[in-house]
Amino acid sequence: MAASAHDYAFQTIDGAALPLTAFKDKVVLVVNTASACGLTPQYDGLEKLYSDYKDRGLVVLGIPCNQFAGQEPGTDAEIKAFCETRFNVDFPLTSKAEVKGEGAHPFYKWAQGQLGEPAVPVWNFHKILIGRHGEAIQAFGPRTEPRAPEITAAIEAAL
């Protein structure tokens, strides 16, 4: 198993390689997302959080996922258009990925190894905070709003 989150890579929503080493010395909030979920309005809070903290070193990384009630059925191009037009999302998005089970992206398997069961997404908009050195800091459940005090306090401490 890899030593840090920086040992993993995703693919951007546009199909380019996205090694997490690109975020060395940044704090990263990794969030599995969906466009047709009751929690989809969290995109707004995620974008505000990103806007508030990006100059201090925070990256929000959206991971579209269709594993929860099929609530992210679109293509990567459709997801990107939805996020940009409905929520003015400016933070990076990856191509669709699985976040739990045998087919889970290796990053999520690593996070579970680091943080235990709290790192396993139970629904859309589950959040995992990664520190500047690639360490797994904390996981937050889907109903925890992006700008909730427990998330902003953890981000402040990590920055």
Task: Set out the residue ranges of the language-model regions.
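Thiol-based oxidoreductase modules, predominantly thioredoxin-like and allied folds used
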Residues: G57-G74, D90-G101
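Short, thiol/selenol-centered motifs that function as redox-active sites or metal-ligating centers
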Residues: F23, A34-L46, C65-F68, E72-P73, ...
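Thiol-/selenol-based redox modules, centered on thioredoxin-like
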Residues: P106-L159
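Conserved helix-turn-beta segment immediately C-terminal to the redox Cys motif
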Residues: K26-V27, A36, T40-I63, E84-F87
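Short, internal strand/loop/helix patches
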Residues: A77-N124
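N-terminal "domain-start" segment that seeds a small globular fold
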Residues: M1-T21, P41
